[in-house]
């Protein structure tokens, strides 16, 4: 999917949620941002840092934990539908498409998990 601001290809991300474990918050963000539902791993498969531009023009560094989600289906409608482009890629295509080098490596290793 693309970011709303820059239109670059990203994975669903969000802020920590009160009373939600990190993996549950990640599953919620995936639903809200890309409309996908499935089984999510409870442990992160990797992490990376990126700069986020806030509404007031301020930039902050965010540490992102990445959780694998085995998608079972995509809903016909979801909260942010129409605000982003959503597209399915092969693992190799996805790795080439994202900008963050660490995220590229995480995506490439997805098929090698046990």
Report residues per predicted region.
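Unchanged
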Residues: 16-105
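Polytopic alpha-helical membrane proteins, predominantly small-molecule transporters/carriers
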Residues: 110-114
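N-terminal strand-loop-strand
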Residues: 1-12
